[in-house]
Amino acid sequence: MRDYIELTKPRITWLILMSTGIGYFFGLPQASNWLTFLKNIDLLRLLHTIIGTGLIASGTAALNQWYEREGDLKMHRTAGRPLPSGRLIAGRALAFGVALSIAGFVELWLGVNLLSAGIGAFTLASYLFLYTPMKRRTWWSTTVGAIPGAMPPVIGFAAAAGGLTRESWVLFAILFLWQFPHFYSIAWMYKEDYARAGIQMLPVVDPDCRSTARQIVIYGIALIPVSLVPALLGMSGRLYLVGALLLGLWFLYSGVRVALERTLVRARGVLITSVLYLPLIYGLMLLDRPGL
């Protein structure tokens, strides 16, 4: 059982569900106080949304590991996973991933709405059939993978609102831009592993990581104005505006440091900052929602 759980990548799934929940809450009508806001929450629909999205995310993770099992065997970081280590056979992992994915789609379709199920299906398909094969061909795969990676809040928003508005795409944009410093820093730290597996991440084709550091800074700069848009649209207030600006500058600072001193220590600093940034900005966004 533990090996099957590991196939679902629980830590990544938790991040996905956090983003889905934020999207759901911002898809609800604005309320004048917390009591009214809580009354607007359809707990059963929220539960179906979380379960369905979690199943699709888990199924996608399992299918991704099934597809990459041979490459994972060549990487120190992933050689101990259930498939390359031989603890699970490929056929069972494939069946497990397919079953979870289908169950997640059905859960969203029947328990929530067709729109959220469709977005979930698009997320799975684009991740598995576009991003995953591209990883061995070009470092631009990170850009392609950031699209399905930013879809969880859109699923949540569609589940609550029954449609998509500019607010849902603002949440998408924040998560989309956030992924580049996050994943480039991971690829930087494990570039030798990725090279052994033949995965064309940017730090692999950019051995001195000069371009990688530049990309981290560029996306850090871009994230700051985009992260302020929720305040301009009335999704959040002044507290969020100030907090998002400070968080963005902090995130950018970690990127500038790695650009000035291209070391593993600085790359790890970007990773740690990115992991802290997302829940902090989500928390501020929700805490400072107008009327609450």
UniProtKB/Swiss-Prot annotation:
It is a multi-pass membrane protein. The chain crosses the membrane at residues 12-32, 43-63, 94-114, 115-135, 144-164, 169-189, 216-236, 239-259, 267-287. One of its GO terms (molecular function) is protoheme IX farnesyltransferase activity. Coiled coil: none annotated. One of its GO terms (cellular component) is plasma membrane. It is an enzyme of class 2 (transferase). It is found in: Cell inner membrane. The keyword Membrane applies. Its EC number is 2.5.1.141. Carbon 2 of the heme B porphyrin ring is defined according to the Fischer nomenclature. Converts heme B (protoheme IX) to heme O by substitution of the vinyl group on carbon 2 of heme B porphyrin ring with a hydroxyethyl farnesyl side group. This is Protoheme IX farnesyltransferase. The gene is ctaB.
